[in-house]
């Protein structure tokens, strides 16, 4: 028996890399990066990170959370039919074409897939069902719990890394003033180890799987599941806003998982879990946007000092350990309140730079370093500025 299980595990691992979504999302992720870079160059005449940064993020940041979720799914013995997995893959690919990660939330993808699967069962779509003989032998409570756990994982990965290297943007307020924003548009690969109903292995344990596998037999399947999170922030620091939303997503996922578990006793609660996930995620997105719009602009021009809107990697700004949201008040001992002042102050000492900074904790600190030939002329710092300041800096350089 152990040999058979080992063979099944090896086969499922090999199929992981043959899954169409694994390769499809390489193209999609590069497209995410291309669109981001194009927007950043249009606004700031430079990019924040290269196109491969999105690729590295997507294919590495979700590995450990995905494996942890797989352990939980395997321990519970949750089985997901092949037909439903096919629908999830198609809906995921369709959502990815929008290049908006917020549409790739598990609350949307899996909920819509469950509704489609339920509809196919209700209306007996024979041609489709015959293509997957056991593809829709669905234990709806198991899938509802699966949905809840996915949403919790989505919130966890967003809390952990969605705020990392957000993309800055500039817009014009209703008063005609430049306003800074931070955009998170992230996707994570979650490697999921699933049980799929079908001829293959049988459990000889009376307590496992917890969620019954129809027919009593199953096989293993590793799949690349892609989950997304998108958010625009202009009324606070991106880490603060994103982590608040991520916590709310985790709470939503917990509520969905509880409803899914309760549906073991009364199956219609699985439908309530789907509706809770779908409507709850929409509500959280609207709530975040309304609250953000109501808050005072965080990234705006100040009477004293320049607020850091973005930091280009591998530049002096990164060496100085500057953070988004900090305010630079003096450069080489000279007070600055616009980009022209900042650039002129740098010219007073081309070999050395000393900054006076108001940190995120409100305290003043000093950072300094040597300057070298060929380094970014603004230290790799992006500020909230208008076109006239761009022209002034260009003429000065």
From Swiss-Prot:
Inactivation phenotype = Mutants show defects in homologous recombination, swarming motility and cell division.
Gene3D superfamilies, alphabetized: 2.30.42.10
| Gene Ontology cellular component annotations, sorted alphabetically | plasma membrane
Q: How does it sit in the membrane?
A: Multi-pass membrane protein
User: Do you know which SMART domains this protein is assigned to?
Assistant: PDZ
Which InterPro entries does the annotation name?
A: PDZ, PDZ_6, PDZ_sf
**UniProt keyword list:** Cell cycle, Cell division, Cell membrane, Membrane, Septation, Transmembrane, Transmembrane helix
- Can you tell me where the transmembrane regions are? 15-35, 71-91, 103-123, 132-152, 187-207, 210-230, 249-269
**Domain PDZ residue range list:** 279-363
Query: Out of the domains of life, which is the source?
Result: Bacteria
GO terms under biological process: division septum assembly
Question: Where does the UniProt annotation locate this protein?
Answer: Cell membrane
Q: What does this protein do?
A: The main function of the Min system is to promote the disassembly of the cytokinetic ring after cell division, thereby ensuring that division occurs only once per cell cycle. MinJ acts as a bridge between DivIVA and MinD. May modulate activity and localization of MinD and MinC through direct interaction with MinD.
By sequence similarity, the record places it as follows: Belongs to the MinJ family.
Q: Report quaternary structure and partners.
A: Interacts directly with DivIVA and MinD.
What name has this protein been given in UniProt?
Answer: Cell division topological determinant MinJ
Source species: Bacillus subtilis (strain 168)
Where is the organism placed in the taxonomic lineage, from the top?
Bacteria, Bacillati, Bacillota, Bacilli, Bacillales
Q: Give the gene that encodes this protein.
A: minJ
């Amino acid at each position: 028996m152990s040999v058979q299980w080992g063979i099944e595990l090896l086969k499922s691992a090999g199929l992981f890399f043959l899954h169409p979504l694994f390769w499809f999302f390489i193209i999609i992720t590069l497209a995410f990066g291309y669109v981001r870079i194009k927007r950043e160059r249009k606004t700031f005449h430079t990019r924040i990170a290269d196109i491969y940064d999105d690729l590295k993020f997507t294919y590495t940041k979700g590995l450990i959370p995905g494996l942890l979720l797989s352990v939980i799914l395997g321990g519970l013995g949750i089985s997901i039919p092949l037909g439903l997995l096919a629908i999830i893959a198609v809906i995921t690919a369709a959502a990815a074409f929008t290049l908006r990660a917020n549409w790739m939330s598990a609350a949307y993808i899996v909920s819509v897939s469950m509704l489609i699967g339920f509809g196919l069962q209700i209306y007996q779509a024979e041609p489709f069902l015959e293509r997957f003989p056991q593809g829709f032998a669905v234990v709806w409570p198991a899938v509802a719990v699966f949905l809840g756990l996915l949403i919790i994982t989505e919130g966890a990965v967003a809390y952990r890394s969605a705020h990392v290297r957000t993309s800055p943007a500039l817009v014009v307020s209703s008063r005609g003033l430049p306003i800074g924003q931070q955009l998170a548009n992230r996707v994570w690969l979650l490697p999921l180890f699933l049980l799929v109903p079908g001829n293959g292995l049988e459990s000889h344990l009376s307590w496992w799987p917890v969620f019954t596998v129809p027919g009593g037999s199953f096989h293993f399947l590793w799949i690349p599941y892609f989950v997304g999170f998108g958010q625009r922030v202009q009324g606070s620091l991106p880490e603060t806003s994103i982590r608040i939303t991520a916590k709310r997503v985790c709470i939503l996922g917990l509520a969905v998982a509880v409803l899914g578990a309760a549906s073991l006793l009364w199956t219609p609660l699985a439908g309530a879990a789907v509706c809770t996930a779908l409507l709850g995620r929409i509500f959280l997105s609207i709530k975040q946007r309304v609250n953000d719009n109501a808050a005072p602009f965080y990234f705006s021009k100040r009477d004293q000092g320049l607020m850091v809107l973005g930091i280009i990697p591998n530049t002096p700004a990164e060496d100085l350990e500057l953070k988004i949201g900090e305010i630079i008040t003096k450069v080489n001992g000279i007070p600055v309140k616009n980009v022209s002042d900042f650039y002129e102050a740098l010219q007073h000492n081309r070999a050395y730079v000393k900054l006076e900074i108001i940190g995120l904790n409100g305290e003043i600190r000093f950072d300094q370093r040597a300057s070298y030939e060929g380094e970014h002329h603004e230290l790799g710092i992006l500020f909230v500025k208008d076109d006239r300041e761009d022209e002034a800096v260009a003429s000065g350089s």
